[in-house]
Amino acid sequence: GSYVNLYPELLAAYEAGQAPKPNIHGNTRCQNIVRYEMFKKLGYFVTESSEHFAEYTPWFIKPGREDLIERYKVPLDEYPKRCVEQLANWHKELEEYKNASRIDIKPSREYASTIMNAIWTGEPSVIYGNVRNDGLIDNLPQGCCVEVACLVDANGIQPTKVGTLPSHLAALMQTNINVQT
């Protein structure tokens, strides 16, 4: 395959107000502005959701700074809303299952079934897992929890070595690693 760096296009779209685009397939309450703002500042696209990233850093949620919440569209009440919606959906599904003559089992987006299938059958799969940093990321503390690509097969979960992260990203991550010790 070939490699195309889409960062310049993503940044230009954000600065022109064309990104992030509304999530028509998912939750429209979460606009991912924090994710793009951090991409602009850090030079790397953040894979964490805007809701979580706003919680993990001191820049977007501050006492007396409701203007930041509004500007970056941080959905402070998102998780309680999701819980209410999920509970209602589970009750609806329960009734459907109780009355169904047949139930079709489909894989979910959760990793548990993927991991179990890969270990049990030996069919390889790649997940992004939280594992102990045993030489995986050089400039983060050994023993801390890190999220890396992992190969899963009959041999179990095998994390991928990342190497050294850009120093400003490692420093930002360290602020959240500090609570692990």
Task: Locate each region found by the language model.
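Long, compositionally biased stretches enriched for glycine and/or charged residues
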Residues: 1-181
